[in-house]
From Swiss-Prot:
Binds 1 Mg(2+) ion per subunit. Substrate binds at residues 34, 58, 80, 139. It is found in: Cytoplasm. One of its GO terms (cellular component) is cytosol. Belongs to the shikimate kinase family. Gene3D superfamilies: P-loop containing nucleotide triphosphate hydrolases (3.40.50.300). The keyword Kinase applies. Its cofactor is Mg(2+). CDD domains: SK (cd00464). It comes from Alkaliphilus oremlandii (strain OhILAs). Catalyzes the specific phosphorylation of the 3-hydroxyl group of shikimic acid using ATP as a cosubstrate. InterPro entries: P-loop_NTPase (IPR027417), Shikimate/glucono_kinase (IPR031322), Shikimate_kinase/TSH1 (IPR000623), Shikimate_kinase_CS (IPR023000). The gene is aroK. This is Shikimate kinase. HAMAP family: Shikimate_kinase (MF_00109).
Amino acid sequence: MVKNIVLVGFMAVGKTTLGKLLADQLDYNFIDLDLFIEKKESMSISEIFRLKGEAYFRQKESEALDLLSDVEQSVIATGGGTVISEENRSKLKQIGRVIYLEAEPSWILTNIKRSAVIRPLLVDERKSMDKIIEILENRRLYYEGTSEIKIPVSHRTLEEIIKDIVCNI
């Protein structure tokens, strides 16, 4: 069995939801990197961005990956921007098998609108689709270059996606 499974992909593609389901199916632990950071910092990701800035958050994200380097039998859901840092990309590959959950921009926007989660990088809703496309284009090569497996998630059921992941690990 794989030491760990690391889920990467854009915000709102289902990393947390799918990660929990996958962990249950594999009898693995589940770790949400953003929640891990929120507990360590005693504030939400939105508050960290607002009060301390993105650079501070990215540093805490990198430190969190260091702390998770020894975990085993875990599914780890990363933040959408974790792959921005070359150092983080290297750490993710060392932690476990990296799976890229790929989604279409329109599907991402639909999920964001349905979600109660505040997305710090998408505060202006009128510009959201353009911003999603821009950020996704900037990160796509990082997602693809870091991952061993790419799983399309748009317009698919959770069950279909989980089955696809399990068949590919």
